[in-house]
Amino acid sequence: MESGIDDLSRFLIGDRGLALLYGRSEPGIETVRSAQPAGPRTLVRETDGAVRACVYFPDAMIDRLERTPPQQGLDETNVDDFAALVEELDHLLLLGARVRGRRSVSLFELELHANVSKHLVLARFLAGGRGRLGDRRRIWLRHHLFDKHRFTDPHAGVRRRYEEAGRWAVRFLDQLATVGLEQRLGLLREFHRASTAGKLALVERLAATA
């Protein structure tokens, strides 16, 4: 993903950074958050044609991931935190890529793209050296990434956005699982490059040819 971001650490903040940011009471800050309430989030502000963004990760979340690192195995103790970390980093990288390409990006597209990315990343970690996931592990991952979450945002439109992004991501991931590696890579590149409408059209096209 050509985001133009060479050093991610410059765009990451913790509890103190979040307090300082909100303490300035800057107007116009858009928030893109994970499914975790009061959890990590991507903060975006556009002023005078320039986009400023950063990702907030709670200190407690990073502490938990350091105690139970995903590279040593994924289970119920770290799957939610690791999924949220991947999701927010994907938001930042996609936003950077779209800004660099002078293209717009919707909140729905950010969520849809991140849902696909976090499944692919976590599946790789969960599979380890075994290659593709077996059915039991695939079902376990699907449950933790998509099935168990109930969005409680007070705004119905926000809830619908998260729910719809999850449904479209699952449809695309199911279709990817039916094709070979070379075709899968091509579809992922097409998915990434496409606009929101293009992503949905791709999913519908794959469904029609299944």
Which residues fall in each region the model found?
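Short coil-to-beta-strand
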Residues: G49-F57, A84-E88
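Post-HExxH zinc-binding segment in Zn-dependent metallohydrolases
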Residues: S104-H144
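Pan-zinc metallopeptidase signature
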Residues: F151-A210
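N-terminal low-structure segments adjacent to metalloprotease catalytic domains
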Residues: M1-S3, L126-G129, L202-A210
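A metal-dependent hydrolase signature that marks the N-terminal structural subdomain at the beginning
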Residues: M1-R52, G73-L74
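Short pre-active-site segment immediately N-terminal to the catalytic Zn-binding motif
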Residues: I62-A83, V105
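Active-site recognition of the HExxH zinc-binding catalytic motif
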Residues: F82-G96
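Long, hydrophobic, amphipathic alpha-helical segments used as structural scaffolds
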Residues: A97, L122-G129, A177-G180
